[in-house]
Amino acid sequence: MAPPHKNHNFRPENVLKRAEDLIAVGQKEAALDTLYELIISKRIRYLQVQDLEPIASLLIELAVELRKGKLAKDALHQYKKNIQLSENGLESVQTIVRKFIDLAEKKLDAAQTKADIKIDEEENAAAAAAATSSAGAGGAGGDAGGAGAGGDDDLETAQTPESILLSAVSNTDSADRTERELVTPWLRFLWEAFRAVLDILRNNSKLEITYSAIVNQAFKFCLNFNRKAEFRRLCELLRTHMQSVTTQTTTKTSGHNAIDLSDAETVQRYLDQRFAQLNIAVKLELWQESFRSVDDVHSLITASKKAPKPNMMANYYENLARIFAVSDNTLYHAAAWNKFFNLYSQSPLATDEELKRYASVLVLSTLSIPQRVVQDVDEHKSKNSKLSSLLNLTHVPTREGLIKSILSRSILKYVDEPIQQLFELLEGGDFHPLSIKQEISQLFQIIESDKEFKKYIPTLTEVILIRIFQQVSQVYDAVKLDFLISLGIFPDLEYSLSELQVEDLIVNAVKDDLVSLTIDHESGVVSFKSNPFDEIDQEFANAGTTTTNTITTTTTIGTSRLQISPAELVRTQISKLAATLSESIYLIDPNYEARQQQAKQQALQRCIKDMVNEQQRIADRSKILKDRKVAAEKRKREEEERQARLRQEKLAMEQKLEQERLIAEQERKKLEKLEKERELIKENEKRKIAEEINAKGIIKIDLNNLKELDTTKLQLMQIEQLNKDKKELETKLQATAKKADHLERAYRRYELNLLEADLEIQLDLEKKDYEFLKQSKINKAKKDHDNAIELKKRLQRILPDYSKFKSEIDAKNEVKLKQLQKEAQIKFEKAKQERIESVKKHRIEELKIRKERERKAAAEEAARQAKAAEMAKLKEELRIQKEKDEALARKRAELEAAAAAAAAPSSSPPPKKTMTFAERMRLKREGKLP
């Protein structure tokens, strides 16, 4: 572990160098701890950002490499907190967090590549094994597709022991297992990195560009790896951030670098985020999250002062249409396509093919709106108003309104021919229930060929069958059940209802009050209501059993009637009678109109007379409402301020607790580090002693099992083993010595007789050897002497020539030798004289230096003696002066005592005065005191 920093080692360059040295020796965790301790220190607030940024960058690299996400998060929070007030502090924070995300993404890509390579190798090995065993086993197929990294497992849910055991013993695909082992940890790390970085960058106007970029990267991460659970959490996190921004704006409690939602660029940036969120939610098929995203987009659009771009709104309406399609809300699905087509048709980039396709979808979605009962329930009203506001509509859309919009804007000219024929067939007035079946089947066969149009056939079938049943009920009083069901079955279609499904549709139509009939299954007859008073009686019966919250139902049957039913005649009889009587009065009484005008004038005068009072009442009421509104707004504002204050206090408390936790964490880490270092030192000492013991070969100690042993115990073990070995060795030596002694005695006793015989043999051999060596030496000496005499005779012949040649050479070299000797003598004398001069000069210099030193020493001694004499003289003067002062003080005291005695005589003797030390010493010198 890295030792704690000292004050002299606090400089950033020293810390960075130490971390690099630790990395170089392979201690990356120690280097990470060293950098982390510097980053979380408060002293770095006074350092330059350019000095701290390399340290933070290296810390992030190590944290990503070692997968220390929590440490990186704490370090980034502290780094931002410490340098955010610096000149370029926030720019450095953006650089570091971007690097953090980029490194995490690179690690994830590397893990994915590694997993792909491993999966390919396993598949190749499995294919080879299958090929070798196919002759015997015939091969057994299986699914090769693993879940991969895009599984539905939750990255924030820790693995339980049961899940680990289950994954180990299960027969899951090896690709899935490889992905889970290699890719999932880095997926989890990258997700935690996104969360940490977004928390660091949130709600700061200078960081919002980087914040938006990281949000887009997080969206891409969720889309690329199909992370649905993480996408939901990401959306909730963004909503929380947005809520805090709006709360700060409304309560006016924004702090330094707060987000300004009145800025057009800021709002546009947030809109881009929400539109991206909506698109990803639709692609991931998270429809509830898509609807929440739509709500977020609509809230931002409403709050924005600047209208969003048309292409963004077109995308917004298109996604809304997809969401409504999933929720089976056909009415708002068609309304969304209507709004989308209005914008798309005005785009200069729109092509004829796209216009044709979108117009066909709009017409099909409009025709697919079923004819159901619209209930005026409060909850439905609020829901419809909410959906209408999302579509920027002022009222709830209707099927008739959408059809009128299609006709008024001539959208049918863009529509495909089969869909245009279907529209004319259903809305053009040529709807014949008994003959339309064949035409519908032909058109549906064409529509089914298109995958996007095909999904509207079920709802179109329901709409068409309901209209058929309604018009049959207007013509017939009773029909066979089989006949009615046969009208609802379209053969030769991919989507065709069965008899049971058609009957179920009829029952639901009766339940929704779209048609009135009864079914007699025993006789197989369907009877339509023919008594004009049946429905009226039923309405009165329902009115008698309902509560005050009566549900008024209206049949919205937008179809042409073949004839008026008896029930309709009864319902409209009174209204027709009233209209007829009114027309008769005009004809019978000519003054009726004049009386009506007079009554109107009188009523108008009364209204004018009461207008002033009514205006005053209205003014008073508006004032009361205004006061109430002001009071309510004040209460709301006070409550919001109180809530904001509580949130600020809570945030401050959390920050304080977090700071205390960080301090405690630092202390704990320091203590742990010290404890680990102590343990490491002890462990090293134990290991060193154990290695020494093992090297000596005294005992054998397992170096991997030293936890329960300490140095004292190891030394005791060594001493005990040495004592034991010593005792064993002494015992063995005694036994060996005793055995050797007995054996040696036996050997000597046995060989005594043999040695005497061997001695005689040895003497004979040695004598023979001596004679042989002696004769050999004599022969060799004679031979050498003869050779030497022969050599002398040969050399004697050349001796005169040698002497003559030597004399000549000596004569030639004698002159040269004398010259060289003379030159050498001259050089010697010269060097000798120079040496003498050098020695003289050196000795003279030494003499001068010695005399100078003696002179200085004599002067210093004289000065010292003079100073000592002066000090002695001064001391003597001080002593004399002190004695004079003492004598004077003594005389003064005697005079004062005498004066006091004279002034106050007393019978008692005067007290004896205590002498000072100086007086006693003076009297002793004078001999007056012993």
Swiss-Prot record:
One of its GO terms (biological process) is formation of cytoplasmic translation initiation complex. It holds the Pfam family eIF3a_PCI_TPR-like. Belongs to the eIF-3 subunit A family. Its main location: cytoplasm. GO terms for molecular function: mRNA binding; translation initiation factor activity. Residues 130-154 are annotated as: Disordered. Residues 136-150 have a biased composition (Gly residues). This is Eukaryotic translation initiation factor 3 subunit A. Residues 355-533 form the PCI domain. RNA-binding component of the eukaryotic translation initiation factor 3 (eIF-3) complex, which is involved in protein synthesis of a specialized repertoire of mRNAs and, together with other initiation factors, stimulates binding of mRNA and methionyl-tRNAi to the 40S ribosome. The eIF-3 complex specifically targets and initiates translation of a subset of mRNAs involved in cell proliferation. Component of the eukaryotic translation initiation factor 3 (eIF-3) complex. It is found in: Cytoplasm. It comes from Candida albicans (strain SC5314 / ATCC MYA-2876). GO terms for cellular component: cytoplasmic stress granule; eukaryotic 43S preinitiation complex; eukaryotic 48S preinitiation complex; eukaryotic translation initiation factor 3 complex, eIF3e; eukaryotic translation initiation factor 3 complex, eIF3m; multi-eIF complex. InterPro entries: EIF3A, eIF3a_PCI_TPR-like, PCI_dom. Residues 72-125, 620-902 form a coiled coil. Keywords: Coiled coil, Cytoplasm, Initiation factor, Protein biosynthesis, RNA-binding. The keyword RNA-binding applies.
